[in-house]
């Protein structure tokens, strides 16, 4: 089961944060028994009380916000929609199924938010590293749901993920195109030309 954190604050101020933590799209980096490059489980995730989450700091611009914090454990930068089979790469291994279901986890976050934060006036959507990559996509969805709100978005640390090539197309392993073309503003995306900047450009347009 997935879990996320909520800090109740002002009803008109909302901060949504997507946790970072690596990603995987090869057997070697997805397999927990090899060299996994992502957080495997959110069961022991604890809420951070530093940086923008240090609400005791007088100069924290988010100290009064309601905060929804989305932990990350799916290896798909929060935008996967596939139970992907990774075949063996070493003798004695069996097929490995990784549940790249970050989109479903984020949908749970959004559904709770929509049901419990009715009319925010100011919304800020952000994330770090792997959480920065999908933040414009989710900011776009959130802006559509709250048309009267002022929505800002900032991706912190996504710049290290550069343009993909034919040998490195993680969004295909993650099943991102199982859903993203159904969302308004993202219909024109295609797997061949996809890069992470595409999400920022589509959200801005």
Where does each model-flagged region fall?
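Active-site machinery of serine-nucleophile hydrolases
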Residues: 7-116
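Active-site-proximal beta-strand/loop segments in catalytic clefts of secreted hydrolases
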Residues: 18-21, 70-75, 126-131, 154-159
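Glycine-rich nucleophile elbow surrounding the catalytic serine of serine-hydrolase chemistry
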Residues: 128-140
């Amino acid at each position: 089961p997935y879990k996320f954190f909520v800090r109740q604050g002002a009803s008109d101020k909302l901060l949504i944060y997507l946790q970072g933590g690596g990603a995987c799209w090869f057997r070697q980096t997805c397999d927990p028994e090899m060299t996994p490059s992502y957080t495997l489980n959110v069961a022991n995730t604890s809420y951070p009380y530093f940086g923008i989450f240090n609400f005791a700091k007088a100069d924290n611009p988010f100290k009064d916000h309601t905060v929804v914090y989305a932990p990350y454990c799916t290896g798909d930068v929060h935008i996967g929609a596939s139970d992907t089979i990774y075949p063996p790469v070493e003798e004695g291994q069996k097929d490995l199924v990784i549940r790249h279901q970050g989109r479903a986890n984020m949908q749970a976050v959004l559904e709770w938010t929509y049901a419990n934060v009715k009319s925010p006036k100011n919304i800020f959507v952000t994330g770090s590293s792997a959480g920065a990559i999908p933040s414009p996509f989710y900011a776009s969805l959130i802006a559509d749901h709250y048309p009267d709100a002022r929505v800002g978005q900032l991706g912190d640390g996504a710049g290290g993920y550069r343009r993909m090539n034919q040998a490195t197309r993680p969004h295909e392993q993650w099943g991102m195109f199982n859903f993203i073309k159904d969302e308004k503003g993202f219909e024109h995306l295609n797997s061949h030309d996809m890069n992470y900047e595409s999400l920022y450009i589509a959200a801005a347009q």
